[in-house]
Amino acid sequence: MPDTSDGGGRLVLVTGASGYIGGRLVPELLRAGYRVRAGARTVGGLRDHPWYGDVEPVRADVLDAEQLRAALDGVDVAYYLVHAIGGGGDFEETDRRAARVFGAAAREAGVRRIVYLGGLLPKDEKLSRHLRSRAEVGEILMASGVPTIVLQAAVIIGSGGASFEMLRYLTERLPVMVTPTWVDTRIQPIAIRDVLYYLVAVAGIREELNRSFDIGGPDVLTYRDMMQRYARVSGLPRRRIVRVPVLTPRLSSHWVGLVTPVPAGIAKPLVESLRNTVVCDEHDIAAHVPDPAGGLTGLDRALELALTRVRDHDVATHWSNAEVPGTPSDPMPTDPAWAGGSLYVDDRSCVVDASPEALWRVIVGIGGQNGWYSWPLAWRVRGLLDRLSGGPGLRRGRRSPTALYTGDAVDWWRVEEIDEGRLLRLRAEMRLPGLAWLDLSVEQDDRGRTVFRQRALFHPRGLVGQAYWWSVAPFHDVVFGGMQRNIARAAEVAEVDGRPVDVAAPTGAPASRDRPAAR
């Protein structure tokens, strides 16, 4: 059995370190005691990763033999986590050439093992081009002369992965779906945490193996079932799914492209692969790697992990924070812009002719009797509607007119985070088809000027949530623009008078002069 907890300081190369799997594998390898060389076509693409300072970054274009020779020098285990999906052109030929170049370079460098993550392959079915290419890459690497372990997985469940994001967007945005026949194809999904567990564990196997292993979670179900399970776990009503035989995989890939923000170049091969049954044919990996402690992760738990940050009202943190995520299922700041579900943001910044302290006093005094510095009638009407629907409305006020603490109620908001003098984060507790936050922060620009930044964030729940955001978006300039101007003006007045301003300006009135934008 491998030692999955101690890499013994051995050096591993992770190609595709800027990608979804690679970016999450690197910190797992570091925690297991390995030294990590993180490879990518451009090293600059690695700098935004939170683990960048703990690895040796290296250029590793898998089509460039010279770069690979340098990247593989002294490496014990090399992870091959690249493929040409979404790249356009003849991606099969590109994948084929890259695997040959990499295998030859690894053999020349004396690499002990190659580890490749491929796709789960059906039996006795015509493969999609995507699955066919993944299978061929595995065969090329196993024939390279370097012992190679190929882990074959179907749909990987974790925020940021293309397959999961497609599932997320389809389910959230379409309460009623007319779908092709592939919705009833059998699939054995696996949680990202289990994929990473196996990827790390196989590096510690001392036996010389040159073969593929099927890996999958404990659930076998259809794509239709997966969408219904996602809806249930995320709190959405059961979806109405009508299957029609006329939608071919090619046509349905265009449909997916219209409904979701997943790029067409990625969505098309994924959809075409859904026509194939992808269920594990064996569990031979168990003879070399024990199941994770507590067993493999079921679909519902995997979905819960992928949605934990949303469920726990922490979306604003994980979409904007560059810290290492708590679990592999969490979003990462380097995930593509279309990953993580919809998050709508109204982001405004302006320079304030006041000290940071004066601006902060106004910010922490917001709400209650001081009001919200913008269109009082609109806030009162919204508060009344919230009360009528069973929400708190504006009646809660605030505990103290001058002091705020984490957990305090402020009208229909709750103080989620305070970074004294810098940030006030409020979470909405009003009745909404989604989750909402308001960030009010004090910053300074490179000229030493005080900058007020105001962000309203909304994570919609289902199609109703999408419709809600776009229905109120035309009023944001009046509501949020007025709030920003009046908070800034209140701070300037407070600076001159030496005291905070207690009364919000009426109707989102503009400032008395043009206010420079922050740069």
Regions found by a protein language model. Give the residues of each.
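A conserved amphipathic terminal alpha-helix motif
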Residues: 465-505, 510-513
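A hydrophobic C-terminal alpha-helical subdomain
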Residues: 247-338, 403
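Hydrophobic ligand-binding cavity/cleft-lining segments
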Residues: 203, 297-300, 304, 308-393, ...
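NAD(P)H-binding glycine-rich loop region in Rossmannoid oxidoreductase-like domains
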Residues: 44-109, 119-126
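SDR active-site strand-loop-helix element
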Residues: 15, 39, 81, 114-119, ...
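Oxidoreductase cofactor-interface core, primarily capturing Rossmann-like NAD(P)-dependent enzymes
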Residues: 25, 32, 124-236, 254-262
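N-terminal Rossmann NAD(P)H-binding glycine-rich loop of SDR-like oxidoreductase domains
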Residues: 2-34
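Beta-strand/loop substructures that line and gate deep hydrophobic ligand-binding cavities in soluble
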Residues: 428-477
